[in-house]
Design a protein with these regions (language model features):
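Short, acidic/hydrophobic/Gly-rich beta-strand patch recurrent on exposed beta strands
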Residues: 14-16, 32, 52-54
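C-terminal structural segments of small proteins and small subunits
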Residues: 3-4, 20-21, 45-76
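Short, conserved secondary-structure segments in the cores of folded domains
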Residues: 2, 27-30, 41-43
Length: 76
């Protein structure tokens, strides 16, 4: 399942090897988005982009196109 498909308020762990192209992967790693870290989609901005997510203890805004590259495990 992709992070962009996750329902609001549901917490899942980021799946290994799920960050797409190297440039996207390095950007997400810099934000603390690593495999095994819990992630929750909290809300979305008007028109659906970006998404506000909790990654571990941090709150981030992630563009929906970047969230398409983040795979999450089926259950927490």
């Amino acid at each position: 399942m992709k992070l962009s498909e996750l329902r609001f308020g549901v917490t899942r762990r980021i799946a290994p090897g799920s960050h797409g192209p190297a440039e996207v992967q390095s950007k997400l790693y810099a934000l603390g988005v690593f495999p095994g870290v819990p992630v929750t989609v909290l809300r979305e901005a008007p028109f659906g982009d970006p998404l506000q997510v909790r990654v571990g203890p941090a709150l981030l805004s992630i563009r929906r196109c970047d969230a398409e590259h983040i795979r999450v495990e089926a259950s927490a």
